[in-house]
Amino acid sequence: MLGNLGRSLSKTMKKLAGMTIVDEEVVREVIKDIQRALIQSDVNIKLVFNLSKSIEERALNEEPPKGITPKEHIISIVYDEMVKLLGEKSHELVIDDKPYRILFLGLQGSGKTTTIGKLARYLRKKGFTVGVVCTDTWRPAALEQLKQYTEGQDVSIYGDPQNRDALDLAEKGLARFQKKDVIIFDTAGRHKEEKDLLREMEELSAIVEPHEAILVIDGTIGQQAREQALAFRKATDIGSIIVTKLDGSAKGGGALSAVAEIGAPIKFIGTGERIDDLEVFDPERFISRLLGMGDLRSLLEKVEEVSEEEIAEESLDAILSGKFTLRDMRVQFEMMGKMGPLQQVMSMLPGAGKLPKDASRMTEETIRKYLIIMDSMTEEELEKPDIIKHSRIRRIARGSGTRNEDVKELLKYYRVTKKAMKGLGRRKMGGPMGQLMRQFMR
């Protein structure tokens, strides 16, 4: 999440956790590391300064609560202050009227049309019927893109490439989808200086009378997001914001903090290219993952999406206990294929930095290869991986059409991951990190 920012902050917290003595010098060193990471992520310097000041004052003057060590207390302070930086609370999209009308706004290239497809998918999974109206008369491919991004989702699309009147398209789409639970209106990409387009946006808003106007902001623009959000806010009443492209953006932290600074609620974030890579934005969960503390609640929710609830609990236990067999690992691989990129899934585990480096680089191709290899194993081998020696490795490789080295690689990955995850068990999570994780796991 957020590329280098997540790695830098997680590394800083890991370094702090390993300190034997925590004094004023250590506190200032930690703050410098945090400052460096945030500035590199394009967070506004004034915000970084205020955050640093708050952390320093609390770390040097507050007494740790009973049973909490000084370094655990500092980690907790960093967590608290960074959550405040991003707005503290989450804002859910509440569909409380029908048809619930959502007007989508955003600059061209912000990922607006893609995000409409993702939100339509999100709403369909919640059981709502969805209609999407294309009022973008500026881009010839706008309607086709909407159809492409909503394909197979049972979402109705309305648009007319011959009609150049965006207001007429909005009126007709509104009339057509009156029986839908939710109507989403796609609009032309706007530039904050294009007065004609901003005026059209105001006119569209008057016709649609949206329950909510959602502004889509490209996370790669960093703190420029502040000015963009303010420009749109002057033209219409923005209900919420979605920040996209946070899966690898170097400036994502700057975009998130800039938007939060002006008080605009961030409801969702885009975390990848897949249709399911849209997450409800929760500052507490988000910061927990950035600091390497994991997000077991989100992980459990993802698991529950692809399995029965009872299996979800067992799967989480298997991941954390380190007792799972190759059979369990096969189930995990199958589920991870549905849950999203492995790097995102792993970031939800507390202490994910302890996992083997290759774990975060696992590709879908590698997972498919490993599944084929495991399909060539006997029931006994899946249950007792330790019995797989030279002759069995050769047989499994021949049966799966892979090399001996591939089978050995799988077994090595299994052993190392099992050992690493064993250290992440629920009983071993103490201090504020443990309290947070146990709260997430309720």
Swiss-Prot record:
Entry-linked InterPro entries: AAA+_ATPase (IPR003593), P-loop_NTPase (IPR027417), Signal_recog_part_SRP54_M_sf (IPR036891), Signal_recog_particl_SRP54_hlx (IPR013822), Signal_recog_particle_SRP54_M (IPR004125), SRP/SRP_N (IPR036225), SRP54 (IPR022941), SRP54_GTPase_dom (IPR000897)
Catalysed transformations (reactions): GTP + H2O = GDP + phosphate + H(+)
Residues binding GTP: 106-113, 186-190, 244-247
UniProt GO MF annotations: 7S RNA binding; ATP hydrolysis activity; GTP binding; GTPase activity
Pfam families named in the record: SRP54, SRP54_N, SRP_SPB
GO terms (BP aspect): SRP-dependent cotranslational protein targeting to membrane
Gene3D superfamilies from the UniProt entry: P-loop containing nucleotide triphosphate hydrolases, Signal recognition particle SRP54, nucleotide-binding domain, Signal recognition particle, SRP54 subunit, M-domain
GO cellular component labels: signal recognition particle
EC number: 3.6.5.4
Keywords assigned by UniProt, alphabetized: Cytoplasm, GTP-binding, Hydrolase, Nucleotide-binding, Ribonucleoprotein, RNA-binding, Signal recognition particle
SUPFAM superfamilies: Domain of the SRP/SRP receptor G-proteins, P-loop containing nucleoside triphosphate hydrolases, Signal peptide-binding domain
Broad class of enzyme this protein falls into: hydrolase
PROSITE patterns attached to this UniProt entry: SRP54
Subcellular localization(s) per the UniProt record: Cytoplasm
Subunit structure of this chain's protein: Part of the signal recognition particle protein translocation system, which is composed of SRP and FtsY. Archaeal SRP consists of a 7S RNA molecule of 300 nucleotides and two protein subunits: SRP54 and SRP19.
Family statement drawn from the similarity comment of this UniProt entry: Belongs to the GTP-binding SRP family. SRP54 subfamily.
Cross-referenced PANTHER family: SIGNAL RECOGNITION PARTICLE 54K PROTEIN SRP54, SIGNAL RECOGNITION PARTICLE SUBUNIT SRP54
Role according to the record: Involved in targeting and insertion of nascent membrane proteins into the cytoplasmic membrane. Binds to the hydrophobic signal sequence of the ribosome-nascent chain (RNC) as it emerges from the ribosomes. The SRP-RNC complex is then targeted to the cytoplasmic membrane where it interacts with the SRP receptor FtsY.
Domain notes: Composed of three domains: the N-terminal N domain, which is responsible for interactions with the ribosome, the central G domain, which binds GTP, and the C-terminal M domain, which binds the RNA and the signal sequence of the RNC.
HAMAP family: SRP54
Protein name: Signal recognition particle 54 kDa protein
Species whose genome carries this gene: Methanothermobacter thermautotrophicus (strain ATCC 29096 / DSM 1053 / JCM 10044 / NBRC 100330 / Delta H)
Gene name tied to this protein: srp54
